[in-house]
């Protein structure tokens, strides 16, 4: 069995207690930093318990796909989001085949161990000029502390974000990088 799935299945029931920001704060955060607008087809990648899924839906005003490898996380997400236009799916990102205008990976990037496979799949799924947004509402230092007890098959330490961005060169154009004491943002646009 997949160790990332096993880990997140085991913590799903208490996961939302870890989020320190209110829904309103998360809504403002997403609207400020994620280049998403009404009408965009979006994927909430590694959606967990659906912390930002309804925010993405409220912005795009259209159906949202939300995928997570953990069935327990998906159960929590479904219980919080009773909306027929939000499609939760328990699956590996590598099995997704729909096309999107934007893929948002919120608070999950360190759990994608094979960054090149992640990059290739995101590129495949994005429409022309589509966005890949990797965003955390924690700093790298906070993330490293948060993940310090996890094995390397569940999470990895992030390099400075400008270094993480290098693997996306040739596939994506970098739109914005933020790597500070409060957050991480790597906003990328599919190169044509």
Regions found by a protein language model. Name each.
Residues 21-38:
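Conserved alpha-helix/loop element of class I SAM-dependent methyltransferases that forms part
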């Amino acid at each position: 069995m997949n160790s990332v799935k096993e880990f997140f299945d085991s913590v799903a029931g208490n996961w939302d207690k870890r989020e320190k920001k209110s829904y309103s704060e998360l809504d403002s955060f997403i609207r400020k930093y994620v280049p998403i607008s009404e009408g965009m087809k979006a994927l909430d990648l590694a959606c967990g318990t659906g912390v930002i899924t309804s925010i993405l839906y409220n912005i795009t005003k259209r159906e949202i796909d939300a995928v997570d490898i953990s069935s327990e996380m998906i159960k929590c997400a479904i219980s919080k989001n009773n909306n027929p236009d939000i499609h939760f799916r328990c699956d590996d990102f590598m099995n997704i085949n729909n096309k999107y205008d934007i893929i948002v990976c919120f608070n999950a990037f360190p759990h994608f161990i094979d960054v090149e496979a992640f990059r290739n799949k995101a590129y495949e799924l994005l429409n022309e000029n589509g966005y890949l947004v990797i965003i955390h509402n924690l700093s790298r230092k906070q993330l490293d502390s948060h993940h310090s007890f996890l094995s390397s098959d569940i999470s990895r330490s992030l390099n400075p974000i400008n270094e993480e961005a290098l693997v996306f060169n040739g596939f994506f154009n970098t739109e914005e990088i933020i790597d500070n004491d409060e957050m991480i943002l790597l906003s990328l646009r599919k190169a044509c």
